[in-house]
Regions:
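Primarily residues marking transmembrane-helix entry/exit sites
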Residues: 1-12, 94, 194-199, 203, ...
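Extracytoplasmic
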Residues: 3-51, 111-112, 116
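Hydrophobic residues within membrane-embedded alpha-helical segments of Major Facilitator Superfamily
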Residues: 13, 17, 24-29, 58, ...
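Short helix-kink/termination motifs in transmembrane helices of multi-pass secondary transporters
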Residues: 14-28, 53, 70, 163, ...
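Residue-level signature of mid-helix packing/kink "hotspots" within the transmembrane helices
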Residues: 23, 54-59, 144-145
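Small-residue-mediated transmembrane helix hinge/kink sites in multi-pass secondary transporters
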Residues: 30, 62-63, 116, 151-152, ...
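Helix-loop-helix hairpins in multi-pass membrane proteins, especially solute transporters
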Residues: 66, 70-196
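Hydrophobic transmembrane-helix bundles of small-molecule transporters
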Residues: 156-255
Length: 256
């Protein structure tokens, strides 16, 4: 097997748990409710925080990869993903599990752009690169589809933390393989990181989602729910204005 396809296998191996973790807890709500004494609202955050934080962090992590090189970003993201998985598996309360899932999302947000950059730098020929990207997309959709199945099997035979603990040996193997196989990509120091804008975007998303969930459940006073929603909308508006005025925006708003 050529080095190109070995590199692709290593990249896909690290991407599998990232995709699975997006949906692996969808069947675990009853188990988590009993084991951690989680409320309905806490269960929603345990499940949703991963996708919400990852969505907000992918773009700045891509910029970070430009600064430090995407191989380093891949190894750093894998290490954070493994540590967060261990913390999640050992979480004693719902709040610590939510925090661990948020950290897990940060690691995942590093891995996603790093894998795409690795594919782009590994396959110079367009037809091979397109095939590699197709396999990457298939692994992502397949991992998300099989997440509930994997979660159900593990919960049937082991304790709830096993859905996270299984990531740890995978990450250790992946780090060893990728450190040796994946080529180093050159860093581009001039790429702005815009971490503040990324944090504002995440805060805006979380506030808007929180206000929507609170409105549906009636947990907060209507005026307070509206205030949180307005705060989230104001932050989102500020983020969009910054992107429109930036010379090198994280998101090119003209595409929408």
């Amino acid at each position: 097997m050529s080095r190109q396809w070995m590199t692709l296998m290593a990249i896909l191996l690290v991407y599998i748990p990232v995709a699975i973790d997006a949906t692996v807890l969808h069947v675990a709500a009853p188990t988590l409710s009993v084991a951690l004494g989680s409320s309905g609202n806490e269960l929603l955050w345990i499940i949703d925080i991963y996708s919400l934080v990852m969505a907000g962090m992918v773009l700045p992590m891509g910029a970070l990869g430009d600064k430090i090189g995407f191989k380093r970003l891949l190894l750093l993201g894998s290490a954070i993903f493994g540590i967060a998985s261990l913390c999640a598996a050992l979480s004693p309360t719902a709040m610590t599990l939510i925090a661990s899932r948020a950290l897990l999302a940060v690691g995942a947000a590093m891995i996603v752009p790093a894998t795409l950059a690795g594919i782009r730098s590994t396959f110079a020929e367009a037809s091979q690169r397109n095939m590699a990207l197709g396999l990457w997309a298939a692994v992502g959709s397949g991992g998300a589809a099989f997440g509930p199945l994997v979660g159900g099997i593990l919960l049937e035979h082991f304790y709830w933390g096993s859905v996270f603990l299984i990531n740890v040996p995978i990450v250790l193997v992946v780090i060893a393989i990728n450190a040796k196989v994946v080529p180093r990509q050159p860093a581009r120091r001039e790429q702005p990181l815009n971490l503040l804008q990324a944090l504002v975007l995440i805060a805006a998303i979380l506030m808007l989602v929180f206000s929507a969930k609170s409105a549906l459940k009636g947990q907060l006073a209507l005026w307070l729910t509206a205030l949180v929603a307005l705060g989230g909308a104001a932050m989102l508006t500020w983020f969009i204005r910054k992107q429109l005025s930036a010379a090198r925006p994280m998101v090119d708003m003209r595409l929408f």
